[in-house]
Amino acid sequence: MSRSAGSFLILNGKSADNEILRGSVKLLRDQGHPIEVRVTWEKGDAARYVSEAADQGAQTVIAAGGDGTINEVAAALAGVTQEKRPALGLLPLGTANDFATSAAVPDDIELALKLAIEGRAVPIDIAHVNDKTWFINMATGGFGTRITTETPERLKAALGGVSYLIHGLMRMDALKADRCEIRGENFHWQGDALVIGIGNGRQAGGGQELCPEALINDGLLHLRIFTGEELLPALFTTLTQPEESPNIIDGASPWFEITAPHEITFNLDGEPLSGQHFRIVVEPGALQCRLPPDCPLLK
């Protein structure tokens, strides 16, 4: 497979029976685009397929699935040497598709696949956590993380992103702030946080825009902390009038360190990571990604 033409499509196994996708792949193949398809079955498959694609000189690796699939593919690409690293394409097929949605990737499968193959590749940032794992979109901690990690799969499948909100309302009795300390470049905060969002991208949890100013090619991570001792009033004000909420703290830095006196959990593009200390560092321009020319996440 030549670097000038070939694409590997790594498809989440949950979407393997998608007939529209099958037809779109055939159409683009008929138009002269070589496309290899690989279907994931278990954790680690995507990384193996990325390695295979790089060894074969693929031009693009397309992550076909939700935010978790994009995360796994992007993390694997970050581990490929730069001279062999294919570009990343996005084909949103998940429940919420937060990263692809905020990047203005088309919902239409054929259009998204065409963009993933033919679109202009631009350098984008990715974030490294504790020198062992990655996220391309967002790390969220606190109550919001518990909701997204605990939301039942059937509810997500039936209602999409709205399911996170509904499940959250059902779990209001579990609202509990996390005490922590957060440091960054020219930033320091300590207190009780209901939700922490550290964004390379802008939205998480099924469409909640936690870091509205974030860009994926500015070399920065954007931080938003939702605070408040009276949690229900704070949450209501934050959701209805965010520009007026005294319970929002914002920051931006190439890195952030979070420490807590007890174990807290961060959700990294859907993957939970627990601990008492997190160091999150942006890797500027680490990946090439095929995005729309009007992508709002690019400066």
Curated annotation (Swiss-Prot):
Domain DAGKc: 2-133
Membership in a protein family: Belongs to the diacylglycerol/lipid kinase family. YegS lipid kinase subfamily.
Annotated organism of origin: Cronobacter sakazakii (strain ATCC BAA-894)
Requisite cofactors: Mg(2+); Ca(2+)
E.C. number(s) listed in UniProt: 2.7.1.-
Residues involved in Mg(2+) binding: L215, D218, L220
Chief place where the protein resides: cytoplasm
Manner of cofactor binding, per the entry note: Binds 1 Mg(2+) ion per subunit. Ca(2+) may be able to substitute.
Annotated ATP binding sites: T40, G66, D67, G68, T69, I70, N71, E72, T95
Name of the protein in its database record: Probable lipid kinase YegS-like
PANTHER family for the chain: LIPID KINASE YEGS, SPHINGOSINE KINASE
Coiled-coil spans in chain: none
